[in-house]
Amino acid sequence: MFISLWEFFYGHFFRFWMKWLLRQMTGKCELQRIFDTYVGAQRTHRIENSLTYSKNKVLQKATHVVQSEVDKYVDDIMKEKNINPEKDASFKICMKMCLLQITGYKQLYLDVESVRKRPYDSDNLQHEELLMKLWNLLMPTKKLNARISKQWAEIGFQGDDPKTDFRGMGILGLINLVYFSENYTSEAHQILSRSNHPKLGYSYAIVGINLTEMAYSLLKSEALKFHLYNLVPGIPTMEHFHQFYCYLVYEFDKFWFEEEPESIMYFNLYREKFHEKIKGLLLDCNVALTLKV
């Protein structure tokens, strides 16, 4: 109750008068003061909040524009705030970068969601070729005897036909598995080997798909904003999402063996523990989680 009242008072009265007072003292609007004071994710995050909670409709809409409209909205913001480009030459550059990051994050989520919603289709030649590519990357010296085969268990699928394991994450789960195996082949082989440990083993592919869900949920909840705002000085892409997934796969394997669970039956418990660890790291405004091998 008290917190709600404070948020109402702050949003409707205190914030307005504080902004007005600071403008009179510094001769600069809130956006300019943010650019003068902060860098990296802190800067973009504060700009995003300032635009979102502004009473000015032009500023509010600026966080929802498409990439092709960014330049126009930067100019509109400068007009609304009476910012002279000759006196503040850096404002336009900084605002454009922030808007590209802010709107780019929203677009990245839509792109990832679109791929996630696409189910694995065994009648789709591209899907089938991608699945075969995964096998060949992980098992280069061993031939797959048949498309429907118990051999799939060797790389961590549950049944004879892997397509059933992609139901939750769609084709996104397979794309991530292939991306890691193709771009970090030696690490993928090492982790696959470790996943066959007699006591601490786990299903490599199933865990990989599970970590796709983790990466997706963190993106959806906006927990990846600090990470991506620090990492990408512009528009984040699917490549950056795949790279974050690779970080999760590599770090989860280390975490699992450090924790030494009694059995795979405790997977959900340790998965959630790892999830909380990652969420904690992502709260740091200076965070940039990259796979270092």
Swiss-Prot record:
Gene Ontology molecular function, alphabetical: GTPase activator activity
Cross-referenced PROSITE patterns: ELMO
Keywords recorded for this protein, A-Z: Antiviral defense, GTPase activation
Domain ELMO: 126-282
InterPro entries recorded: ELMO_dom, ELMO_domain-containing
Record keyword RNA-binding present: no
Cited Pfam families: ELMO_CED12
Record's keyword annotation contains Protein biosynthesis: no
GO CC annotations, alphabetized: membrane
Entry comment describing in which tissues the protein is expressed: Alveolar cells (morphologically type II cells) and alveolar macrophages (at protein level). Expressed in brain, colon, heart, kidney, liver, lung, muscle, placenta, small intestine, spleen, stomach and testis. In lung it is expressed in alveolar macrophages and alveolar walls.
GO BP terms, alphabetized: defense response to virus; regulation of defense response to virus
Function: Acts as a GTPase-activating protein (GAP) toward guanine nucleotide exchange factors like ARL2, ARL3, ARF1 and ARF6, but not for GTPases outside the Arf family. Regulates IFN-related antiviral responses.
Name under which the protein is recorded: ELMO domain-containing protein 2
Source organism (scientific name): Homo sapiens
Gene transcribed to yield this protein: ELMOD2
